[in-house]
Amino acid sequence: MAKKGGKNNKSKKEVTPPTSDVEDEVQDKFKEMRLNAFTATGALASKESSRDVKIEQVTLTFHGKELLSDTTVEINFGRRYGLIGQNGCGKSTFFQCLAVRELPIPEHIDIFHLSEEAHPSERTALQSVIDDAEKEVKRLEVLEERLLEEQGPESEELFDVYERLENLDPTTFVPRASEILIGLGFTSQTMLKKTKDLSGGWRMRVSLAKALFIKPTLLLLDEPTNHLDLGACVWLEDYLANYDRSLIIISHSQDFLNAVCTNIIHMTQSKLKYYGGNYDNFVKTKAELEVNQMKAYHKQQEEIAHIKSFIASCGTYSNLVRQGKSKQKIIDKMEEAGLVERVQEDKIFNFSFPPCGELAPPIMHFDNVTFSYSGKEADVLYRNLDLAIDLDSRIALVGPNGAGKSTLLKLMVGQISPTQGFIKKHSHLKMARYHQHAHEVLDLTATPLDFVRSKFAHMNKDTEEWRREIGRFGVTGKAQTEAIGCMSDGIKSRLIFCLMALENPHLLLLDEPTNHLDMECIDSLALAINSFPGGMILVSHDFRLISQVAKEIWVCDNKTITKWAGDITSYKNHLKAQMRDLTKQGALASLKK
């Protein structure tokens, strides 16, 4: 049986964005609380030497809340699983549990959990990937010697080690590592930058590149596309679709899960339920099973009601009483075998943004805007932009990382100012912005109820009204009075959307809003955007959301913005072809060095 979680936490680390010293202390406190607060038990049912893993009677609790109860973990070698479930159901905690072996996973199965960025050092991105590959070769060589000595040359585990060593040929390290890094958005120049000079997002890509290069037996990827632009997303999608070891992905992207996954694991109602096929197959199969389950439920309930009606009509006649007792035994046997349960639907919260008043167009106009962070001509990010935005604008900004998508949103809200030119805004324009570090505004020690109430103290609302406001965004019940720091990132994101709605904006600026949302919540967001009478500008790597809400695709690249002539599907196909060419060219260039 597995030990209590939290006893061996040296490897349990998470990445947080840069904050103040006080915020760091609070973040660390809640991080430690999360990592020490789960307990896991289970019994290994698969062979110790097998690359397949089956663990039965699995129970997982977090802060006393039961996330999994008497369920089975089953991971078959070579399968690619998508782990799905609503925000707060415990997907990331389950990953942590697997990664630190709180469940009895055989030691010969090496696990890589993408949870922290590469360490900042003097080594370049390329060298960092190769360093890990060389360490992996040494580890496998030591393992080879031990297995030969302990199990002999016919060992099952030994064959896998030979295969791994054959694939980790040092003569191919440079071109292979280069191809992966370029696929993840590096150029031949940026991959030669020292990791200490890279941002956290780029160091996370280095960490992902390391995992893809060494190909562990079990790879755990928690929202791997969160730090990627659309080009890197389509490359990773293609790459993982050919991953031939065991892979489990947590992702909010239906497109991504459809392209990559061979199986789906649904974490719901404290159970792990397994489905064959990709996400679309899961939706279809689940719907069919639920229809059949409800038919069986109604049929059984009708049968029980009929039997009970007969028993009630028997009265005191001895022969009828005997028949009644016989009929009661039928019900008793049904209950003993387990009655068919009614389908329990997961709660889906449909939120909305309030109506905004009319404003004369354009509500915002970029007049010959040029921008450079340094102010120097050599560092110009945008040149001579001339753009107009109205209340009916539905725009998706796409383009490579570093092209200036987030910068454009910062210019719009006035966080930064143009180097040249002017941005003219309607005098009554109100904007609400979601960005990738929006969670930093939250007071982790406060409760959602107290925090939202303090942010909008000028609003004359009583406690019940505030509860309803927060509840509309899926933060309900006890969650309203628990510390924000103990909540999942998905719940925190919903709280940010609540704050945005209370601003009553005319224009929504959404920079990667789906990063921590479950699929149902993303669909609710799409509905909220489509019913919102104001304008919307979106930066997202979620192709499905873009297809749901965007009327225009604006490409940010080469210091300007151009409108894409087609839809997001045609742009995705364009990116796929582009990324294939780039990775080939990068691998060839690395061979010539």
From Swiss-Prot:
The keyword ATP-binding applies. Residues 53-294, 364-583 form the ABC transporter domain. Gene3D superfamilies: P-loop containing nucleotide triphosphate hydrolases. Residues 1-25 are annotated as: Disordered. One of its GO terms (molecular function) is ATP binding. PROSITE patterns: ABC_TRANSPORTER_1, ABC_TRANSPORTER_2. ATP 2 binds at G399, P400, N401, G402, A403, G404, K405, S406. Residues 1-10 have a biased composition (Basic residues). InterPro entries: AAA+_ATPase, ABC_tran_Xtn, ABC_transporter-like_ATP-bd, ABC_transporter-like_CS, ABCF_EF3_subfamily, P-loop_NTPase. It holds the Pfam family ABC_tran. GO terms for biological process: aggregation involved in sorocarp development; sorocarp morphogenesis. CDD domains: ABCF_EF-3. Coiled coil: none annotated. Keywords: ATP-binding, Nucleotide-binding, Repeat. ATP 1 binds at G85, Q86, N87, G88, C89, G90, K91, S92. It comes from the Eukaryota. Belongs to the ABC transporter superfamily. ABCF family. EF3 subfamily. This is ABC transporter F family member 2. It comes from Dictyostelium discoideum (Social amoeba).
